[in-house]
């Protein structure tokens, strides 16, 4: 039995949960998320909590037990609190701005790069170098932040590029000149 999977998921008062077999819909103050859980698990609602359990003790079922519990917990937290990832743009002339809903990043290329957000994702830019990606779906927020970082990943010599807030870039020494 999964140590993560056997923990019940507390459901806040503001969050409504609808179960239909392996389909789950979670509604909260920030929005609504739906997901179909993988085969091999069962889900039930007990009082103000959700319990995910493995149907049998086969390997596939045990593997998906903890995964399913984490997915449901992320959905409940997403519709009640939301998720956000912060990115920092480092480098001379590198900056970002929001135009409508789209994010426009100038990262040292000959042209600005435009990032179009999927539904449920918002971009906020503070003082041209700090970008916050926020939404209710943890997976979607992480993927969008990774796409923005991939525009210009931080390089190890000067540390220029787009990095996550708090990310430590391991620096390399440059060439040691001829002596």
Curated annotation (Swiss-Prot):
Pfam families: Ribosomal_L6. One of its GO terms (cellular component) is cytosolic large ribosomal subunit. Keywords: Ribonucleoprotein, Ribosomal protein, RNA-binding, rRNA-binding. GO terms for biological process: cytoplasmic translation. SUPFAM superfamilies: Ribosomal protein L6. This protein binds to the 23S rRNA, and is important in its secondary structure. It is located near the subunit interface in the base of the L7/L12 stalk, and near the tRNA binding site of the peptidyltransferase center. Part of the 50S ribosomal subunit. Belongs to the universal ribosomal protein uL6 family. This is Large ribosomal subunit protein uL6. It comes from Prochlorococcus marinus (strain MIT 9211). The gene is rplF.
